[in-house]
Amino acid sequence: MKKRPAQHIIPGMPPGIIIPSDSAQHPRGVDLLTYSADAVDERPGLAVDDALAAIRAVTQAPATPPQVLWLNVSGLADAQLLKKIGEALTLHPLAMEDVVSLRQRPRVDNYDSHLYIPLKILQQDDNALTFNQLSIFLLNNLVVTFQEQTGDVLDAVRLRIRHGSG
């Protein structure tokens, strides 16, 4: 297994500050998946402002049948992007700090407006096992995922949603 680099902790910084690790990968945009019992709409590689505008439009005018939105970010190096998403969706600052802190243990944190679930994903790359962090936020009709690496570990979930079995 590959060993992770040490996490940078800056003494005196207030809690909730987003500081990506040196090994973090830059996101390639965000992916937005909107689905209901009847339809699936995928928009990969969106600018964050476009994705947040689409989320606001759906949440302000609920559709029939109800829709679920899934915002996915792969790569955690862009602190401003992460901060913008966290503030726009009112995600707890300590949970957003934990998104970039790659030594989180799996757990469920219950905040007023959402749940935060950090998980470890085991992957095999070039005969080596690696652990990658997957952070999940569950809100009302909205799922937000942050993947440590730009490779997508959630393709199987998307496939099930596309075929109506997810």
What are these regions (language model features)?
Residues M1-G166:
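Peripheral, non-transmembrane regulatory/ligand-interaction domains of membrane transport proteins
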